[in-house]
Each structure stands twice: as C-alpha cells, then as structure tokens.
C-alpha cells in the first residue's frame, strides 16, 4: 500500500518543478519594437505546453491519492494497539472454581496427554466417573487439608437427587509430579469396587483444579467414633461389632493388596464408618490436620505416622529421619497396629512412650511391641496372636488375606460354642511365619496363584492333595533347603545338601494294601491283600497302632545319614519305649535312612564285608541303614547303580518301593508274633508296607531252604504259628491279608521240600505274609524257582528262629535283628566255618525268586525279596566261588562290626519284609532238621559259630572283602547291576515285609535275592529303586529317567557271582534269602554290604533333577554292599539255633555266617530281643557282643557309605547291646522304624558316636522335632541316638553313610543338598478327615474294599505348617500326569523306599515337623492302581508296618513294582516334595470342597 502513494508524490513533485521552471523562463520578456515579436511568441507556446502537461499530471496524481485514501481494503492495523484478540483469555480457575467461562469465550481444555493414566485400570470413556461436572458440585465447607490442598464437604447434584460427597482439591500450584501423585493416590478407591473400600465417585481433571470426589461416610472416621462411643462399647454385642469391624478392615486391605494397591496411611483414623456401621478403608488425606499428635515431621517437612509405620521404612542419616515408601509388608504392620487400636478403644499406640522413645525402642531397636489389647473377648490370646503375626519381620508377616482369614475364623468361633478342634483348626489357618520366596514354589504352576497371592514368601511347604480319577494325588512342595543341622551332620556330597526333593507316590498296591485288600482276600488279620490300589485308603492312626488299616504318607527329606539317624533315634526312642515294637519301628526308620556317600563308596560302605576298618567299625545297623536296609537308597540309585548293586540290593530297593510299608513293619513284628503287643505293632507295619520282596522271599525260599535239613519243622511251625497269630490279630494285614498267598507260599514251600506241616505253620505265620506278597506278585513262585537259581549258593540264610520271627513279624518281620547278608556273605566261606559256627550259622534259605516272582517283586510285592535275594544269591554264587578262593572274604564279611551285623539285621528285617517272613520260614526250615527247640538252639549255636568263623574270616578277609566288594561291585555291576535293576527297583517295597528280629540272626536274603535277582538282573526296575530324581518335585519315579542304569562294573570288586543271575538286569530270578543268625556281635552285614556295594555303585539315577536321587545312587551304592540293606541289616546278632542247613553251600553258609556277622550289634539284637521283635525262638542271644565287631570292609566298602556306616556303627562300638532296643531296620515301608530300630541299636552304639539322625532335638525342616511322633520313647532313644549321632556326626563317614542311605532312595541330588526332614504326613482314623477326597477307586481297587475299610474314616492330618490344596484335576501340573504315571509307580514304590534313607532321615527330621504336623492323609486312588498295584506293594500295604512306626512315619510308598508296573503306577497320584525353604511348612491350610469333612476341621487337623 505504501508503494503507490510514494510514486504519486514523486510525480507530483516532478510536475511542480516543471511548472515553476516554465513560469520562471517566461517571466523576463524584453519590451521591444515590432521586430522582436516572433521569438517571444515561440517561448510562450513551449511554456504553455509544459504547463498543460504539468497540470494534467498533477490532477492525475491528486486523483490517485484521493482514490487511495478512500480505498476500504487498505488497513493500517499494524499501527494500532488492538486488544480484541485477547478477549478469549480465561481468568484463573482459583477465582472461579465452579464457574465456567462465558459461552462466547473460546476455551482451551487441558490436553489429555498431560493426565496420568491409571496404572491398573482405565475405565471406559462412557463410564468415566472422572467426568463429574464441576457445575454439579456445591461446596459446603472445608473440613481439612493435606499436602495436596483442601478437603471440602460438598454436595453433588445428579438429576433430581443430591448426595453428600467429600472433595479433595489439588492446589492450583501443584507441579506435574504432584498432580500425578494426587491422582495415583485416588486410584485404588477409583478402581476397586469393594464393600470395605472407600469409593471414589469421580475425578474432575478437565481443568486446573484437579478434583477427586469421594463418597461420604456419615459416622466419620472410626477413631473418632470409637472415642465418642467409648462409654457404650460394652457387652458382647459391641465386642462382636468390633470383631466384625476388624474383619472388614483386613478384608479391605486384602482387596487392595490383591490388585497390588498399597495404602499410604493405614490407621484407624483412615477407616471410615458408614451409617450402617460398615467400615471402609480409605484416605481423605486429612489425618495430619485432624490428628497431629499421630504424626511427626521430618527435616524435609514431610510428615509420617511414626507409631503406625513399619520399622523397616524408617531410618536415619546424620540425625535426619528418612522414610521409605509403603510396601505390602509395611501395610501388614500398620494393619496390626490398626487392629490393636480397634481393640483398645482407639488408644494411641505406645501411648506411654514419647515419639523419640518410639523411634528408638520400636523402630530402631525393635524390642518393644504393643501389649495385649484391653478388649475382653473369646480367644483374646488368639486375636492378639494375629496382631503379633503382623509385627514379625517383613518376610515372616502373613498376607492380608491370611490375616483376614484368621480374624474371620476367630470371629466365627467366638460366636459359637468352643470346638474341641479349635486349636488344630486355628493352627491350620495360621499363616506360615517362615519367610520364603514365592518363586521357590513355582514348581507347581497350579499353586502359583496361591503362592503369589496368599502364601507368597511365607509359604514354606505346600502339600497339594489333588483328587484325580485315580484317587488322591499328593504334591508336596517345600522351600529350597536351608543349610541346617542336616547339612551340618551330613557328610554327604556337597550337592546333597540344600534342597531335598522327594517324590512320594503311593503305589496302588501300597494303597490297596493300606486301604483294603481285595474283597475276597482278607487276611485272618483282617487285612486284605489286594494287588490293586484300594479305592479307599484308611487313614493311619498315628496314635492307634492297633489299627491295622491305618496308612500314612511319610516323607523324608534327603539329608546326611546323621540327620536321618537323628530322626531315627527319635523314632527309636519311641520304639525303645515300646521295646516290643521297637525293632520293627526301628527297622522302619532305619530303612528310611540313607547314608549320603558317593556312589562308589556308598556301595562298599553299605557292604560291611569290606575290609575297610571304617566299615567294620560302623555298626551293622548303620550299614544296613545306609545300604541294604534302606530300599530307598536302592530306589534312588540309578539303573546303573541298581545294576551295580547286588541283586539283593535291588530287591531291597524294590522292597522299599514295594515293601515300603513292609519296612514299616519292623522286626518287632516277629516279636509281635511272640508278644501280642509287638505283634500288633508289627502287624500294622506289615500292613503299611507291602511285603514285596520278603513276601516273595519266603515263597522264594530256595531249594536250599527246602534242602536245608537243618530247617526245623518245629521252627517252621513256630513261624507259621507266629504268622498266623499276627494274621489273626490283624497284625500282618498287609502280607497276611491274602490267604491265597499263604496257600501259594505253602505250595511253593511244599514244592521246595518243606513239610506240609512246616509249610502250614510257616506259611500260616510268616508265609502268610509272604504269600500275600506273593499274591501281589508272582513272587510266591520265587520260592520254588528260588529253590535255587543258584543252587546252594543262593542260600537264604534264615536263622531258624530269627527267620521265623521275621515271618511272624510279617512284612516287618524283616528280621531287624537278623542281618540280611546283602553283602557277598554267600561267598563261600568254608562250609566248615559255617557249620563250625553252627549256632551262629542260620539255616540258609536259598530263596530265589523266579523271574516272574522277581518281576512281581519288582511289582510291589515280590520285588523286595528278590532284590535282597538276588543280591544275596548272586553274592552267594560269587561268594561261593570266591569263598572257596578266599574264605577270608566271607570272614571279612563276617568281620563287619557287630553294629554292621545289627545294621544288617535291621536291614534284613527291613529289607526282608518277606525276607523276614522267609527268615522265619527259613529258620523254621532250619529248625525242621532239628527238633524245634533243640534244633533251634543248635542252629543258633551253629549260627553263632558260623558268625564267629565269619568274624575270623572277616578279620582275615576284610581286605579280601573289600576286594570282594569291589569285585562284587563290578561283578555285581555286571550281574548285580542287572539284578539290582530288577532287584533294586522291584524289591525295595517288599523289603519291609517280614521282620523277625528274634531268632533271625542274619537273613542272607541278599544272596538268595542276588541269585534269584541275578537271573532277572536284566530287568531294570531302577525307577522303583530310587524316587524320581527330577528337579521337578512332582516327577514320579516311574518316569524313564528314574530307571536304574547298570553302573560300571568297576564298582569295587563286586563279586560277579554275587549276582549269579546278574545277567538278568531286570528282575532277580529267584531271590535267595539268606538269613543267618549272628551269634554274638557277628555281622552278616559285612557280606551283605559288599553285595550292596556292587549294586549300589552300579546303579545311578538317570534324572539329574533330583539331587536326592543323585545322592541316592550313592546311598544305594552304599546299600549295594548289602544290595538289600534290609537283608544286610536283618542279620541278627542274636544267636540262632545251632542247626545249620547242611545242604547250604559253603558260600551260603559263609553267607549265613557273614550275615550273622553282619547281624546288628548286640545292642541292636538285644534291642530287637527286648522289643521282643527278636522273640523268635532260637534263643536269640541279644548280640552278645555289646560292641559291634569291627569288621573292616573292603576299601571300596570302607569308602562307601556302608563302610562308613559300618565304621561308624562299629565306632559306635559303644553301641550298647540294645537288649531293649529293637535292632530291626525296615528299609522299606518301615524305613523310619527300621532306622529307628537301627538307630536304637546302631545309633545307640554307633550313632551315639556318629549319627545324629535320631536327634529329634534338632529342629526339623520346620525346626520342629518329631516329639509329636508319639514316639516319645523313640525320641528319647533318638536323643541317645542323637548323642551317638552327634558322635557319629563327628564321624562323617557314618553320618554320611546314614544320610546317604536315607537319602539314597530319595535322590543323590537331594543327597547333595542339605537333607531336610520331610514332614511326615500321617493319616489315621483318628486324624482329621479328607474323606471326601479319599474316595475308593473302583478301577484301582478291583476287589471291593473291605467293609471295615469303607467304614473307616479317612483322614488327612497335618500339623500347623502344612498347607494343603485340593484340586479337582489329575495333577496339579498336567505335565506331571504322564510323568507321574511312569514315575509315579516307581516313585510310589521307589521314592519312598528310595528315599528310604533320605526318606527315613526326612521321616526322622521331618518327622519332627511332619509328625508334629500330624500330616496324615488318606488317599484312595491317588495312584494308578496297576503300576502301584504290584502285588508286592499290595502285600506290603496289606502287611502295613506296625501302626506305631506308621504313626510316626508315613509308610513309604508301596514297594515299587517292576519297571513295567511302576511306569503305570499312579501317573496322577503323587506326593511330591519340591525344594522349598525347609524352615517351616506353611501354616496356612486350604482345603477343597472335597475336604468338606476334613475341610475346616481337617484343615485345623492338618495343623
């Protein structure tokens, strides 16, 4: 616009200049005459032209300018101060908080981007409560203020209604961070919809003054209400109101925590009361303005409620107080203080302390807690206990949900009559105060929700009971093991220390035996001997030993042998209290125990025949426990290890699997036969453990037995009578349950050459049990085939009386007193030496289990015996061959310390569930040639002589023995490996079958088993041998990885002949049960340990997951020396009748002698005697040598846990002759009892010096002792044993041996980890009931359960620390199902046995916790019927261990069946333990609807 005017101006100026110039030029005109006229005219004309032009231009320019000025488009706005654009400015919101700008003004809203979105939940735009129209709010008054600004009481208009609201207004000067904090503080109340949480009605965030609109609680905050109503807060109604309010406060906080919201200032002042007296947890942010006395100000001008703040949130730096943000744990602390306020009339916490005092005493020193509230109310102590839970260290505090549950329970209980079971239920509800990382519980995804939400860090142990089509499935999870006394005591591998995982799956057979025998197969004892898993598993009455139908789950944590000893002593104490049953129970306990040793050393160690002085020094019992006695060890050994293990050890392993319950029948069973009380106990144990191996063993009595002229018909008759007595008394329920078995056994015996009368008696007494086992599996035929797979070599040395007693003991008649010569005792010691020791030489029963028998042994039933038998048999052959070469070897075997002998006896007892039965039979057979009494005594004398001879030989051949053990290891590895595969897997369950501590001095079941197993060696039942070793807790043994693998034959010089049938890797052909009576302090175990060594070393666990199993192979190898630890241990020190089977091959005799030498110490024997477990005829001399003879096992053996055990036990020469202490070591079902028995004898002697296993005083995983086991006597013994254990603890070898032994069955890996006692879950009729969960499985139990069983109450009982989840699915983790199927069977049969030592140790350790926990539950179809149904298992189950032991320890899972069976066994049912902090079990108990009966009561009961 300026351009044109400038141009025009220029033109105008130019025109003016021209005009001026023209006028100037024309002005001067001279006045001349006429002549000058023309020029003037010219100038004027040019001038005119110029002027005209100038005018024209000027006019144009002027017109142009005028037009420009008049042009409307031209705007000079830039020159003006125009403020019209600023009219849109909105005045500050503070000036018009509720007034919006005029409509004509353009408004810019706050960008949504600047607003923080809720972290948890963003409500839909349609339902945005935040869109509360500001104009709908009307402020009434300001009621307080906070850091954020003002809090106003107002009204909100919604349509035609008006409601009171509380408005929190954020100050306009708030920065973005403060805005974010302001909105986040309101998030929980905006998102959560809960009746006990304050509701945020809406948010106003479209304009600067952010508003949060909350519901208004008419009665104000709870603190002011209580203070105002203090005068009226009296009476029951007001107390109930306060209790309800407490529950509502906890519920509100729990709802916040569930969605991970935290309360910024939880206190009574921030709990608001509605008009209907409902409490709402919230925060208006005005606490400080209304209750300034409750807050203190920090140097940075921040205020916080000191008296409600958790100590961990407050710290000081350079005299400046610093506070951290709230956490869930700190919220729990504040919750406790809030509840205290509620119950104390809204008093100020620590009102007697100044803020500085509170800061020092409560926050910094943490030594002051709030006193008990003044409110008088029912269970006021429990209410206060809940508050105290909230003030524990952060990791131990309960979750808000736990607090709410506890308060709700207390509130309900306060409103009803007091319940008898209140304490139990309360304990069940109590949160676990032991801190744990919830991540540790991730093993079971199904538990993740519970672990994260509820248990979280606090969940120590979780037992999951899942009801499946197969029955109840048990999953046990516990925290990663902590280094504890187990670790300290364990000399085991470094790997075996921390977390011990044990998977326990009850085998169908186990269940059926436990729950009820087949409909038509009830024993005289009233126990059926079903081969299937019973539909209903009776609950084991921990306190009612007389209940034959009682069954329980026993978990034992892998730990050092010492640990196991610790617990076994506790068990021992109880056993000692009741000497009659001590043997069986001890046997049971011992069987559970496993020595933690290296595989190589384990085998040798278990073979007490090694020359290593360590071995010799170890008491036989220890040896037995470590090796032969603990089928668990065998179980956990790998296939190779099992192969390495002599067949007898395999049998023992199988015995543990199948005869787990049989193991529980301590040698006391035999005593029980003699003494009704004992008989009862034994019967129970028998019932509990299927007598797989031993049942088969008697059937497997080999031709040697039949050929043994020494067998006294009277003895057989006595055995039979005892057996019948047990049966009639329902003591031999498991093995005796089947008359079919009895008949079969009788037939077998007849075939074997037994007189019908003898067979009748023995079958009736011991054979009934055995037959039951046989019923479970073809094991019965073992006797016939047994008749001597190896001829004389496969002699089952049955001390006439001891064997009888063993048979009487039924599965428990494992002849704890008698030491199974699992070692290579069969090595041919000069026949003369054996006969020379006629007394000591028990008749050797060549109990060879035919392959099917062994297979059946592998099945829960027959497996147990075959393992030992095969081991023994193979050993016998090897020994026979070797003995001839080096009689010293057998002597060396004999040289095993008496403790070894005791161990052997115990092991024998435990191992020879059937074996004990066999031993009885054998003894009877032995006695047959002689007059009952005369022959019995004569035989005993001979046995003693043989033992002495063996002792001499042992001294000579200790080194040879070591070599032999090595040879055995290698040969056994070749033979026994196979045998062990078959034996260890199949036989462990049966091992606990019959235990007759009385006269059964030494049961060289190992030889017989070795021989019989030798033929079946190829069959690998390793999985049964040891529980699944997968890291996955729920993994079952059945899984392929659990199969035992043949160990390198290099295992020591294991005698090739040891497993004569070593070629058969799978199953021992015919278990040869050699039961030798150990004369004074003679140890048949030495020989046995060798065999075990071979087997154990040979076997190793495939799975790298379970440290337990990993260690178990070692343990197993430890066991290997006596392949059947039971057999080893079973050798009794008690003198047996002189009569020696003339036909016994020298090796068999030697075996017998060795077995006798392996016999438990005098103490053990005497214990057995005193427990009247040894009541078997044949004057069972209570091991005359109080100090176990120190036999020097072979170097390998010495290095092996067995040798260590032997050494320790021997070192426990202080091992007092435990006349009152049962020496029985039931390695399988009664592993714990065996262990106890062993512990009583071996621990008293060697444990006093070595093993702490029996130490109940040592805190369990849960830091609890097994005092609750009801084994007060055992505990006492355990204390003695503990002292011994402590001593032994000093002797790491023994300690580790025991631990390895116990842990062996569990897993070598677990062995490596600290062995934590596994809680023993006891089920008993008297216990709480999970009846709904315990449903009979028709499929599993082909035979209808006996009416009694059906009528019986099923109960799962836990004590305070067990959390039980009941899920209606196959397995908590589906992946476990298939695995469970495979591994379950073996696990059931094997894990418990395999964990025999670890299991025992756990039983012992966790006994304290578990027994305390009272963990007992009954499962009907927890496990697949078929796999677990191995006849051995069912027999084992039918012949449960005596209740006494069972009440202390859950019976080991039914004996494992052969591979074929246990892969099938209960894929879904499993009881697994996964590493978790062993510190404690979660007190929280969740029950499924299935547990209606048990439900709350059961829950409480669980506690």
Swiss-Prot record:
It is a multi-pass membrane protein. The active site is at residue 265. Keywords: ATP-binding, Kinase, Membrane, Nucleotide-binding, Phosphoprotein, Serine/threonine-protein kinase, Transferase, Transmembrane, Transmembrane helix. It is an enzyme of class 2 (transferase). Mainly expressed in skeletal muscle, and weakly in brain and pancreas. The modification Phosphoserine is found at residues 806, 886, 1107, 1305, 1307-1308, 1310, 1450, 1496-1497. It catalyses: L-seryl-[protein] + ATP = O-phospho-L-seryl-[protein] + ADP + H(+); L-threonyl-[protein] + ATP = O-phospho-L-threonyl-[protein] + ADP + H(+). Autophosphorylated. Phosphorylated. The keyword Phosphoprotein applies. Residues 597-606, 1277-1296, 1409-1424 have a biased composition (Acidic residues). Gene3D superfamilies: Transferase(Phosphotransferase) domain 1. One of its GO terms (biological process) is endocytic recycling. Residues 1-10, 64-1503 are cytoplasmic. Pfam families: PK_Tyr_Ser-Thr. The modification Phosphothreonine is found at residue 805. Belongs to the protein kinase superfamily. Tyr protein kinase family. This is Serine/threonine-protein kinase LMTK2. It comes from Homo sapiens (Human). The gene is LMTK2.
